Amino acid sequence: MRPLTGLLLLAAAIAQPAASAAPSASHPLLGIWVLSIPQLGCSETYHFRGDGTSLVKSAEEVSESEFTVAEKPSVKGFYKLEDRVVKDNGKKDCSGEIMQIGSRATNYLRFHPSGARFVMCQDESMQACIGPFERMPAQGI
């Protein structure tokens, strides 16, 4: 029975999405980014780390997520980003919302050729996007 149990556990592990697959060290997303939201008088800071986790500060909210991001852009020029919130301090973000642990999101990133900014879109078009996210010097948030 043990070999069968081990085989089932191995199959389950293989079937899981590669949520822990860290991006390459040269991935353009890694680093600290700021999204300014002037109409709300607020900004959000995103720190995408090399271990596949991110730390976000938005108004009073501080949250942590696990993410996966495509290594290369699609033929349309977008990087697919999948994100799952794993920690949150329960405080309101810039929009007045409170993020729920376990929330998942899939977005598509389009980088400026300079690599210094990107927009985050609902799909692989420029029809529903937020940004620009501006790269910041490496520092803690």
Where on the chain are the PLM-derived regions?
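Contiguous, well-ordered beta-strand patches that form the walls/edges
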Residues: 38-41, 58-115, 124
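Bacterial N-terminal signal peptides
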Residues: 5-15
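Secreted/processed peptides and extracellular or luminal domains of membrane proteins
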Residues: 48, 100-101, 127, 135
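C-terminal partner/receptor-binding element of secreted or periplasmic proteins
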Residues: 124-141
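N-terminal helix-cap/turn-to-beta initiation motif at the start of protein domains
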Residues: 19-34, 47
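Short, solvent-exposed coil/turn segments at beta-strand boundaries
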Residues: 29-30, 46-54, 70-73, 110-117, ...
